[in-house]
Amino acid sequence: MRTTIRYAAVLSIMILAGFAASGAAQAPAAPATTTPTAPASTVPAVPMQWVAAMYNMQGGGTTWVTLHADGFSSPAQVQALKDLLKDQGQTAVVNQLNGMPQIGWVRFGKQTGYPIPVIRYIPTATGYRIVAVCARPIGFVGAVTQGIIETDYPNGVVTLDVKTKGNSAGQVLPAVKLEFNEDGTFDPKVYGTAPLRLMQVREESAK
């Protein structure tokens, strides 16, 4: 049975990092889910690359994941996508993402990489966060997207929380539906029963 689950943590990530422009006009997130941010700083030079071990919470072993960025999306670019979603719906956003240039990719094991048109770099109090939005679902062996209808859950998301000290981690959300609540709050719905955990996250030399 297919199940749609809402994750509060995912909602916080997407509102704060993926689909909210920095600045005014955004409702403040609840204290329990807000990630403290560091003062604004210059976006680092690209290319950048990270590697992580992906653990399937439902079993299925470990896969090494590589995320590569040749550029980062600006708050204005992300706000434009948010406005498009609110005004014209998910299909319009998907069409826009498919027409945008690729600024990165994510690869699972030795499989062909998934192109990424949107990557956000957000400084935090403990390091920085990366939110990468794919133009299509992430369907790899063992993922929860098997048999999914791409028109309903058309985007995949990869997040990394990279810390200057301590362990860094992240998540893979193989398939996400883009929606707003009645109050205008962005409310993504995740297909499947659980996200896929990323552990042992570290930067590596970009090739």
Predicted regions span which residues?
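Positively charged n-region of N-terminal signal peptides that target proteins for export
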Residues: 1-6
